[in-house]
A protein has these predicted regions:
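Adenosine-phosphate binding glycine-rich loop
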Residues: 2-23, 219, 335-447
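Structured beta-strand/loop patches that form or line metal/cofactor-binding pockets in enzymes
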Residues: 40-69
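Flexible, glycine/charged-enriched surface loops at secondary-structure junctions
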Residues: 21, 37-44, 117, 154-163, ...
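Glycine-rich phosphate/diphosphate-binding loop of Rossmann-like nucleotide-binding domains
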Residues: 195, 200-313
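Rossmann-like adenosine-cofactor binding region
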Residues: 263-365, 370
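Glycine/serine-rich phosphate-binding loop and adjoining beta1-alpha1 elements at the start
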Residues: 94, 113-228
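N-terminal cap/recognition module
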Residues: 69-110
């Protein structure tokens, strides 16, 4: 297998799908050497099959807004790979959603889910619309219209969606309510991220952020460092950033900045519990403005319009917002501001040249598919609880999450340790996930 040849073919076939092509290239470059040591993979054309989704559903979403006007959006569900389990991946409600974005996310999800060691395949979906600016009634009607089409291609043993950007507990509730009515059955295993009183898992909202900090803590311990006292900067203020801030503070780190589309909120003395709680209020407001934090806590926070968290002096950077949010220029600014560790919490949050800069300039770097796997891992634990008709305590879920993140870190170290003793976490994560999926595909035949 030659990465250059496969990429040339994909670029000719999908010329405008930048995110998808970027994700595929990163994985293929990491696994090429190992792949070529397995002629059985080449004979079965594993890579050529793995880079194409099993299927993509595209459908119209028609709903009525509060003014009585009919609105039309496009919805998608990309079922990428089910070699190791039923399709599993979130629903992203965002106006920038495209097939390319969802293919990239579904491809990444395939390897992320494999890293958890839980039996879950990869998928992703969503519409080209988001909750911002919509009333609660409009969000409910939109979710119902979306599920009116989606329900035909999901199921507890087939495809289990969850939340993602723009989809939290409220949206999952509306989606499940419509699914229940259409399917005429009460089967909570069809969605994860549900409310704790009706089949959801305790700690699911915090899980991605918590898991990211457990992985970061493992990385630092491996490097002979301690997270206590470290200054941390975070991008975003949604569920992922909230969970990351909460766990970072609990572990003794000091979160000194969070950011939004409007700018950065500096918190010199570190974020407090009250401020972390207020992040949920900010997200629920649908204003999408981090300046609200500075207005609510004027003595503790300072807002700077148009700036990013990367402009603040720190030890550790946690991109928690969106794909490709951290550029080469941002990476250089972080390094100049004292940053020596960057762990992606968003999916593909760093651009390729930013990752290259980190890896060649003394900055520890770990990729999103490993760092943020705690979210889907806890979704997997929710699936287990639903299937077994049991409910675990928060402590039990947290212990299982911590164990899974420890195992993911160990897999990255196993496959990513270089001859000079350094650890390439990108290569380690990609090879570990790839080998599990590739082996399953090989053993299941040419399908």
């Amino acid at each position: 297998m030659k990465t250059s040849e496969i990429m040339a073919s994909l670029q000719a076939k999908y010329p405008g799908e930048k995110e998808y092509l970027q994700a595929v290239q990163e994985v293929l470059e990491s696994v090429e050497e190992v792949y070529n040591q397995h002629p059985e993979f080449e004979k079965a054309k594993i890579v050529e099959r793995m880079v194409e989704p099993d299927r993509i559903f595209t459908f119209r979403v028609t709903w009525v807004d509060d003014k009585g006007e009919v609105q039309t959006n496009t919805g998608y569900r990309v079922q990428f790979n089910s070699a190791i389990g039923p399709y599993k991946g979130g629903l992203r409600f965002h106006r920038a959603v495209t097939p390319s974005m969802l293919k990239f996310l579904g491809f990444e999800q395939t390897f992320k889910n494999a890293l958890t060691t839980l039996p879950m395949g990869g998928a992703k979906g969503g519409p080209d619309s988001d909750p911002l600016g919509k009333s609660d009634d409009e969000i409910m009607r939109f979710c119902q219209a979306f599920m009116l089409e989606l329900w035909q291609c999901i199921g507890p043993d087939q495809d289990i969606p969850a939340g993602d950007v723009g989809v939290g507990g409220r949206e999952i509730g509306y989606l499940y309510g419509m699914y229940k009515k259409l399917a005429r059955e009460y089967n909570t295993g069809v969605l994860t991220g549900k409310g704790a009183t009706w089949g959801g898992s305790i700690l699911r909202p915090e899980a991605t952020g918590y898991g990211a900090l457990y992985f970061t803590q493992n990385l630092l311990h491996k490097a002979g460092k301690d997270i206590k006292g470290c200054k941390v900067v975070v991008s975003g203020f949604g569920n992922v950033a909230w969970g990351a801030c909460k766990k970072a503070t609990e572990l003794g780190a000091k979160v000194v900045a969070i950011s939004g589309p409007d700018g950065v909120c500096e918190i010199p003395d570190g974020i407090t519990k009250e401020m972390i709680d207020y992040m949920l209020v900010m997200r629920a407001s649908n204003r999408n403005m981090v300046e609200d934090m500075a207005e609510a806590f004027p003595d503790k926070a300072h807002f700077i319009a148009g700036k990013k968290s990367w402009s603040v002096k720190c030890d550790i950077a946690l991109p928690c917002a969106f794909q490709n949010e951290l550029s080469l220029e941002d990476a250089k600014e972080l390094k100049a501001n004292g940053c020596w560790c960057c762990c992606e919490v968003s999916n593909m949050g760093c651009q390729p040249d930013a990752i290259h800069f980190f890896q060649h300039n003394g900055v520890y770097f770990a990729p999103g598919k490993a760092v943020n796997a705690g979210g889907v891992a806890t979704s997997g634990l929710e699936m287990t609880q639903n299937a077994s008709h049991i409910s675990w305590s928060g402590k039990e879920v947290d212990e299982k999450l911590h164990f899974i993140m420890d195992s993911i870190h160990e897999a990255c170290v196993k496959y990513g340790t270089q001859p000079d003793g350094t650890i390439d976490y990108v290569k380690g994560a990609n090879i570990a996930g790839f080998m599990k999926v590739a082996t399953a595909m090989l053993e299941q035949g040419t399908i």
